[in-house]
Amino acid sequence: MSIDNQIQVVLIDDDPHLRQALCQTLDLAGLKVLPLGEATGLTARLSRDWPGVVVSDIRMPGMDGLELLAELHGQDPELPVLLITGHGDVPLAVQAMRAGAYDFLEKPFASDALLDSVRRALALRRLVLDNRSLRLALSDRQQLSTRLVGHSPQMLRLREQIGALAATRADVLILGETGAGK
């Protein structure tokens, strides 16, 4: 079962008390949270265009946070993953950041630090997804311009109309003289 696009934060921590406290902090800030006790199987549940962020403990039984980070970034290298740990040291933080973590928080941390990092990560995620969408639209438009020859005002208008119609599920009937290349 895939994760709903309404979920903004997937929170993974094996400590149920801390998971509940962090979930409550994020809930009170108006964020929709999916709390999980383990990371196994998460990658299969997230689509490449899921609009949220992942907050994960590093040290957990089964799949740890660094393994999860590598797996998630194998599917989508631009997905923000925040790693938290109670056993932080400088080499671990450096390893996490080099692996592509968006942020690294050492427990105990202020709620505001988590909220600030999550909000910045969500803003970045929105920009990344908007950028992908715009690139796809530009690519589609460029493909159309290479297939339709001509630069007259009528051809430009035709390209615009085709672009607008392509986004709908309507049937289209093209009329014209025989041999005109309909």
Model-derived regions: residue spans:
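Active-site beta3 strand of CheY-like receiver
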Residues: V10, D49-V55
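Receiver (REC) domain active-site loop signature in two-component systems and cognate sites
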Residues: M60
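Acidic catalytic/metal-coordinating carboxylates
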Residues: G37-E38, D64-E67
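Two-component/phosphorelay signaling modules centered on CheY-like receiver
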Residues: I7, P16-L34
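AAA+ ATPase active-site-proximal loops
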Residues: R135-K182
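Short amphipathic alpha-helix used as the core "switch/output" element in two-component signaling
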Residues: A44, L66-E78, Q95
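Active-site residues of response regulator receiver
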Residues: D57, T85
